[in-house]
C-alpha cells in the first residue's frame, strides 16, 4: 500500500497544512471504501464488476427526473414540474409571462367582472345630515393611519380639523424635552394626550357636522400659540388686539379708559368735522378718539365742510412745561455745537497779537537746517515758520 492511498491523519483532524500537495490521501474512510468498490478490476480478469456498475437506461431516466424535481439550491425558484404546477396551468410558452406572485391575488378577469366602486366627489354639503354622512364615510373608508393630521370633508374647502404635526416634528420635540431633563414617561404621556385630543376633535366633528361652503383661508387659529378664535374677529384675550377692520384701529388705540372710548364697529366722529354716515368707525388718523394730551390731532375742524374744501389744521398754541424745557435744552445743545465748530473772535485776536509780537524777534534761528549745541531756542516757533520747520 503506497503512501498516497493512506489517509492523512492531519486531514482527519482538520489541520493539514499541505493541502493538495500532501503525500497522503485527503478523504474520509467511508469515501475511500466507496472508491475501492467502484474501482474496476485493474488486471482485466472478467467483466462482472463492470457490468454491475453500469446502470440501466431506466435507472438513468429516474435519476434525471429526481434531479429535475430537486429544488434549486441557490433559492431562485424551482425547476421542472414544480415550476409548471405553481404557475399558470398548461405548458409554458415562450414570450408568455404568466407567473403570479400571490395565487390568492385577483387576476385581470376577476377585476373586469367586478364593477368599480364609484367614489363620490364631496364638493357640496347642503344640510348637516349629508355632511355627517360624508364625514362618516371618510372615517370608515379613508381613515388616516397618522392621527395628528388635518381633515376637510369638502374638496377645496376649509379644514374642519387643524393642527398637523408630523412624526419628525414629534420626534424632534421628544429629543428636545429629553435634553431639558423631562422623563420618558412624561414625554410619552404628552404624545398620548395629543393623540387623544385629536381623536376627540374627530368625534366632535362627526357629532356636530355643519354645512360649510366658505373657501379655505389661512387663519391665525391654525397656530396653537394664538388664543384668538378668528383671524379677523375682535380679540378675546388680554394680548395684542386683533382688529375686525382697519376702522377699529383708531378706537383701539385709546390709552386708558375714558368717556371717548367707543366699542369696535360703532360710529365715531369723522376726520373732517362732521359725523360719519357709514356704519363703520372712523379711520385711525385724524379721529378725535386718540388721546395724547391734546383734543385732536389736527385741532377742531368746522362742521359741514365738503371734502374738497379742507382747511389748514389749526394747531393748539398752548405748550406744556415739559415740552418747553426740552426745546430749551435742544437749543442750548445746538448752540454749543455751533460754537465748537466756529472759532471765537477772541481766540483769533490773541493769535494775531502773538504773531505781531513774534515779528520783532530774530527769525534766523528758525530758518537753520541744523542747530548747534546751545542754540536750541526754548520758546515756541512763530506760526509763520511752522510749515517751514515741519
From Swiss-Prot:
InterPro entries: Nucleoporin_NUP42 (IPR051767), Znf_CCCH (IPR000571), Znf_CCCH_sf (IPR036855). Keywords: Activator, Brassinosteroid signaling pathway, Cytoplasm, DNA-binding, Metal-binding, Nucleus, Transcription, Transcription regulation, Zinc, Zinc-finger. GO terms for biological process: brassinosteroid mediated signaling pathway; negative regulation of brassinosteroid mediated signaling pathway; protein ubiquitination. Pfam families: zf-CCCH. One of its GO terms (cellular component) is nucleus. Plants silencing LIC are short, have increased leaf and tiller angles, and display both reduced number of rachises and seeds. Plants over-expressing LIC show erect leaves. Transcriptional activator that binds double-stranded DNA and the single-stranded RNA polymers poly(rA), poly(rU) and poly(rG), but not poly(rC). Mediates optimal plant architecture through brassinosteroid (BR) signaling. May act as a negative regulator in sterol homeostasis. Acts as a negative regulator of BR signaling. Binds to the specific DNA sequence 5'-CTCGC-3' of BZR1 promoter and negatively regulates BZR1. Acts as an antagonistic transcription factor of BZR1 to attenuate the BR signaling pathway and regulate leaf bending. This is Zinc finger CCCH domain-containing protein 46. The gene is LIC.
